[in-house]
């Protein structure tokens, strides 16, 4: 719904499910959800999660408004400012900002922001982002090294295999890419 621009960013969008498998959680994380709530849950847990998600929406409203206006440059700039000032939800803003920078083709800036996130906190999504920026800037071999390190830390990180396969294709290593994509599909069979 978000990708089709049918659901505004100001709307809090949660998935409520009894499915707790890694594949289901990974698939939900790839979608544009604000949260994932496992059943059973208490009313107070639901209230707390929705309240926190709504608070995040309020803090990041200028960023979401810029995205909805297709002003990705402004949105990326607002994300970088929030990250640098360590304002509330600075890591969340950095994640949005890096995606916007990649979309805008500003790969070096995206990589710099990903690396700043890693320096602040070693988060897997930031390391994955460094690899994506490396591929986009023609450094597929360096991306493979980055991704192999990430997979070494967490062999169940399906997105890392997906990006690794892309890097292998870029280098013409098609048989390796097929095996890598096979591993990714085994980790997330329902996606």
Each model region followed by its residue ranges:
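"A position-specific structural signal for the A-helix of alpha-solenoid helical repeats
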Residues: 61, 95-96, 129, 163
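Start-of-helix register in tetratricopeptide repeats
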Residues: 57, 91-92, 125, 159
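Flexible loop/N-cap segments at domain edges
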Residues: 108-191
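A Lys-centered signature of the CheY-like receiver
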Residues: 39
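Hydrophobic/aromatic residues positioned on beta-strands within the core alpha/beta folds
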Residues: 14-16
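Alpha4 helix (beta4-alpha4-beta5 surface) of REC/receiver domains from two-component response regulators
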Residues: 7-10, 20-35, 48
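Residue-level signature for tetratricopeptide repeat
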Residues: 61, 65-69, 100, 133, ...
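Receiver (REC) domain switch/output surface
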Residues: 46-57, 62
């Amino acid at each position: 719904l978000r990708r089709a621009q049918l659901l505004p960013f100001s709307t809090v969008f949660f998935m409520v499910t009894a499915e707790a498998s890694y594949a289901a959680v990974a698939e939900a994380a790839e979608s544009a959800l604000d949260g994932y709530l496992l059943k059973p849950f208490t009313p107070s847990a639901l209230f707390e999660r929705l309240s926190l998600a709504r608070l995040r929406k309020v803090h990041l409203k200028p960023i979401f408004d810029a995205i909805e206006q297709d002003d990705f440059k402004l949105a990326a700039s607002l994300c970088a400012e929030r990250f640098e000032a360590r304002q509330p939800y600075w890591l969340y803003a950095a994640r949005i900002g890096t995606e916007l920078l990649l979309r805008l083709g500003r790969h070096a800036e995206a990589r710099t922001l990903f690396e700043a996130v890693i320096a602040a906190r070693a988060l897997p999504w930031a390391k994955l982002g460094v690899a994506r920026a490396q591929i986009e800037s023609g450094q597929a071999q360096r991306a493979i090294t980055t991704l192999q390190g990430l997979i070494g830390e967490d062999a169940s990180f399906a997105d890392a295999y997906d990006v690794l396969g892309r890097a292998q294709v870029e280098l013409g290593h098609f048989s390796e890419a097929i095996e890598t994509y096979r591993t990714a599909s085994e980790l997330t069979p329902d996606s």
